[in-house]
UniProtKB/Swiss-Prot annotation:
Name of the gene this protein is made from: pgk
Pfam family, one: PGK
MF terms in GO: ADP binding; ATP binding; phosphoglycerate kinase activity
Protein's GO biological process: gluconeogenesis; glycolytic process
Protein name according to UniProt: Phosphoglycerate kinase
Catalytic activity: (2R)-3-phosphoglycerate + ATP = (2R)-3-phospho-glyceroyl phosphate + ADP
Amino acid sequence: MSIVRMTDLDLSGKRVLIRQDLNVPIDNGQITSEQRITASVPTIKLALEKGAAVMVTSHLGRPKEGTWSEEDSLAPVAARLTTLLGLDVPLVRDWVDGVDVAPGQVVLLENCRMNVGEGKDDEALARKYAALCDVFVMDAFGTAHRAQASTHGVIRFAPVAAGGPLLMAELDALAKALDNPAKPLLAIVAGSKVSTKLELLSNLVNKVDQLIVGGGIANTFIAAAGHDVGKSLSEPDLIPTANQIVADAKARGAEIPLPTDVVVAKQFLPDAEASVKSLDQVDADDLILDIGPQTAAHYAELIANAGTVVWNGPVGVFEFEPFSHGTETLARAIAASKAFSIAGGGDTLAAVDKYAIAKDVTYISTGGGAFLEFLEGKTLPAVAALEARGQ
């Protein structure tokens, strides 16, 4: 990877503009999860320690360009950064045409999505961003898949463009998992629909040794194998696609193990009566809501023997206690495994939290959409721009 790293640069006396992902949930002016803010602090501290004059910006929500609104303001984030850094972090509202900041100071530049031209990667705006700094640092992996003025255009025009520690840690972990994995490489891909994870499945099937499918996705694969899935969520029109993915796996000696037993209910309710059935016992009015204990034990054994595990999606309706055991079994197997493990996606992170295994997963991706697009084999605009500047 030819990307210039912020950690390698002399920043003494330099004006440094850092694009962070500070898009945190805010309810009535109160931040309800500050994980992204906390994650950004080491990068800001590093820039300060290196003697830089630090400017930080981020998006928050989806404001209308050209209009300021309190609900989309980074004001609560500035207050939290002031506390976490132990120094005053003023919020600058109109900043595109110039910012006053001295070495040793930090300013937070108001929500960049309020700037006209941000979303369309406007060149004139990107050049103005670039003119604010000596060094631009892209540290927001979660927006690396968006070609916008603050995530792409500015990289082209800044005097120096570098990858920040958070972004580089994410790219290093993903490269380790996919480009040069310890074998066997096992991926868990679960979710409600094959259609939303189709590109992901099609890309991973050419890389992995084992591909475990879960949730509604698994139901489509179960139906493709000729089993009745009752009234479970599935996509009959994608059965030929599922068969093709299975054939592709088989052709290169990879395996897509299907459940042998499942947990079913008659209703989709948190307290629905759950029963374990083998695949051939599923009734026409059954809903498959989790993998069965026999299947979970088999999958856990595969995880225990894996060299690398990529996890995207819970394998059952883990929010409902009777249908949470499959996901819990796999989560605990990943935690106990010696494999290099990477987990990402909103529901996956909720499962990691629920079973308190964060410290036992090698790398937790906060990237969301960018994580998925990387797994799909797509080029991320911000990464491509940084690589071009690093040549």
